[in-house]
């Protein structure tokens, strides 16, 4: 390959579309199972330039005849350029992460900064915190020792103001994993998570619940790719390209998730929105029926509402971990907080309101069999829809194209506002 990424496991990587967007060259992923395979790859040198990800950012350093100052200071290389068989190593993670933190409102100067994780990214974050003028830099790991706190010890530091996650905790396919409970730090001001898949980890979700700046690693990824691409090609790329590519990629990855009462038009408008966006449409209730091998009324009859809700949660977790979908939820999907968290991790949630007179009664809907049942349901669920949603639109019952327009506008506005 000419350009690409090497690492042990790359199924989570978004690097190819980023580099192809930034540099206009083909970018390939090459998984190397161990350091023996890494050594053979470096020996052959059959590449022009590559990026390096975990766990090889330190292992590649001896092969580099030149190391830039950032790589030397941090002790990690994420970019290698092959110039006539001579390898030069660079660290562009530093510049990418520092820019992402600054633009995301993560202020380090004069703060007590806690870094989660003890791998290579920790060195990058430590260097940034130091250069930004942090008052104190703490590092926490699972085992502690040698200047590293355990997570339990870190929890007792009530003065922590900024948390930087340098670990892979919460990264796909381990969605939902989280190392800490942010509620133990009353002075907390902001959180940065190097993880970008999913876009909203449980760590970031906690921060957003407190109204704090919460930044994922996607802007860092695009930023370091921009600086790496400059080394690859020798061409200067304006910093504005980082923001453009970040917006483009986010628009492709983010799910559009529709919530609302039964009969509000989620399925019909969702299909139209999916067609307009050129992406797949998924109806959660249909997925539940497919997995169960029976209809929703039959599930309620045989397993009760509890059984149905358990199935719904499993489907929400599966779909929420995917990207680039339009998802129509069942009317009761918001009844469980874990469903909302699962759907928000990669999704913009839009609440579709509709007047009570226009909502459907009966049919394939066991819990809305009458007007009275529907009124009670709306009173109970409306606050949950509002709390779950990033945006609200009203479906007037007019031409479906108008509702589709409003839903798509809400989706784009939410992304522009930085909800993910």
Question: Positions of the model-derived regions?
Answer:
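Rossmann-like adenosine-cofactor binding region
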Residues: 147-215, 333-339
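NTP-dependent small-molecule kinase module
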Residues: 243-251, 272, 276, 348, ...
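Adenosine-phosphate binding glycine-rich loop
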Residues: 31, 194-254, 396
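Phosphate/diphosphate ligand-binding glycine-rich loop within oxidoreductases
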Residues: 2-104, 198-200, 204-206, 210-213, ...
């Amino acid at each position: 390959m000419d350009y690409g990424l090497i690492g042990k496991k790359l199924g989570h990587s978004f690097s190819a579309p980023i580099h192809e967007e930034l540099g206009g060259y083909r970018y390939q992923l090459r998984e190397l199972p161990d350091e023996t395979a890494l050594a053979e790859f470096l020996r052959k040198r059959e590449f022009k330039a590559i990026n390096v990800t975990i766990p090889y950012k330190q292992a590649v350093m001896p092969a580099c005849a030149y190391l830039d100052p950032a790589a030397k200071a941090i002790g990690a290389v994420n970019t290698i350029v092959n110039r006539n068989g001579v390898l030069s190593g660079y660290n562009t993670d530093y510049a990418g992460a520092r820019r992402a933190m600054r633009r995301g409102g993560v202020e380090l100067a004069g703060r007590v900064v806690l870094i989660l994780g003890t791998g290579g990214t920790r060195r990058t974050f430590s260097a940034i915190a130091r250069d930004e003028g942090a008052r104190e830099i703490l590092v926490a790991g699972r085992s502690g020792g040698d200047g590293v706190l355990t997570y339990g010890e870190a929890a007792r530091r009530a003065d922590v103001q900024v948390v930087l996650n340098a670990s892979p905790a919460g990264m796909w396919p381990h969605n939902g994993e989280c190392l800490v409970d942010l509620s133990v730090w009353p002075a907390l001001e902001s959180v940065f998570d190097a993880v970008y898949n999913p876009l909203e980890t449980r760590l970031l979700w906690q921060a957003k619940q407190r109204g704090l700046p919460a930044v994922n690693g996607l802007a860092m990824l695009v930023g370091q790719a921009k600086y790496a691409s400059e080394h690859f090609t020798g061409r200067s790329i304006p910093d504005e390209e980082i923001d453009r590519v970040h917006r483009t990629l986010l628009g492709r990855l983010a799910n559009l998730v529709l919530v609302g009462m039964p009969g509000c038009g989620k399925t019909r408008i969702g299909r139209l929105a999916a067609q307009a966006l050129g992406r797949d449409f998924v109806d959660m209730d249909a997925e539940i029926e497919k997995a169960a091998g029976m209809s929703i009324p039959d599930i309620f009859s045989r397993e009760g509402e509890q059984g149905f809700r358990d199935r719904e949660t499993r489907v929400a977790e599966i779909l929420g971990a995917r990207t680039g979908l339009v998802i129509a939820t069942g009317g009761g999907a918001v009844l469980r907080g874990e469903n909302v968290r699962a759907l928000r991790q990669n999704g913009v949630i839009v609440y579709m309101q509709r007047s009570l007179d226009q909502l459907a009664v009966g049919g394939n809907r066991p819990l809305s069999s009458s007007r009275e049942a529907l009124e009670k349901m709306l009173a109970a669920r409306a606050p949950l829809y509002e709390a779950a949603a990033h945006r609200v639109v009203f479906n007037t019952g007019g031409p479906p194209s108008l509702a589709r327009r409003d839903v798509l506008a809400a989706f784009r506005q939410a992304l522009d506002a930085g909800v993910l």
